[in-house]
């Protein structure tokens, strides 16, 4: 048991086993899952959702392992995407709503594992600064689940395309065909919107892994980082 667990009043273990890699990809996904369960339970206890809704959401959660397996089977697409980063000076990850923190996770993993500069931004804030960074050939990863922000995210993506950015598009949307100006597109299995951040995180982590492999970086022990931080 860790020091922080011993000193805490309440602990929610993620039951994901030992995490060897410093980047903690498994721990992050485990934390998302546990937080989903916590929010679901709180909503039920507070009577914000009824028993039918609670049961339906639990049923959706049980579909997650199979959806993850399908996502992993698309690894070859991510290997092709990874080649786009070899000569890049940096990259940008864009998302709206619940996809914004996923963009931050994708950028962090790329920085940690491949030593390539990357930044995550809210797609809606592009015109307040980040758009100035777009130049010809810059890899821009756009995370666009089929939610209420989808059309606005596509509009932001068009702004990037118009300025020469190289789009790597990740979505769970099955309805629309991928824009011909998208360099690479990856569809993850569609699942309930509350669970989609988990599935959308996975390809970003795998992308960082494959970029690191191409650059001959140690994916388990990145330079200058340690599993346990002992100095503030």
Residue ranges and their predicted role:
Residues 1-232:
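A SIS-like phosphosugar-recognition module
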């Amino acid at each position: 048991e860790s020091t922080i667990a011993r000193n805490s009043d309440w602990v929610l273990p993620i039951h994901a086993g030992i995490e060897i890699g410093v980047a903690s990809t498994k721990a992050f996904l485990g934390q998302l899952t546990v937080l989903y369960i916590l929010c679901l339970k709180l909503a039920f206890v507070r009577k914000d959702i009824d028993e039918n809704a609670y049961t339906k959401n639990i049923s959706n959660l049980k579909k997650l392992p199979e959806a993850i397996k399908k996502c992993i089977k698309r690894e070859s697409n991510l290997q092709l995407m990874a080649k786009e980063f070899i000569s890049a000076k940096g990259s940008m990850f864009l998302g709206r709503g619940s996809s914004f923190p996923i963009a931050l996770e994708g950028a962090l993993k790329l920085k940690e594992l491949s030593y390539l500069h990357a930044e995550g931004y809210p797609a809606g804030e592009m015109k307040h600064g980040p758009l100035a960074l777009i130049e010809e050939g810059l890899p821009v990863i756009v995370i666009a689940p089929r939610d209420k922000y989808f059309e606005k995210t596509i509009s932001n993506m068009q702004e990037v395309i118009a300025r020469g950015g190289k789009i790597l598009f990740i979505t769970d949307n099955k309805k629309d065909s991928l824009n011909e100006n998208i360099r690479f597109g990856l569809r993850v299995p569609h699942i309930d919107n509350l669970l989609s951040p988990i599935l959308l995180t996975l390809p970003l982590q795998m992308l960082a892994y494959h970029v690191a492999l191409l650059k001959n970086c140690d994916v388990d022990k990145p330079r200058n980082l340690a599993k346990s931080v002992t100095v503030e």
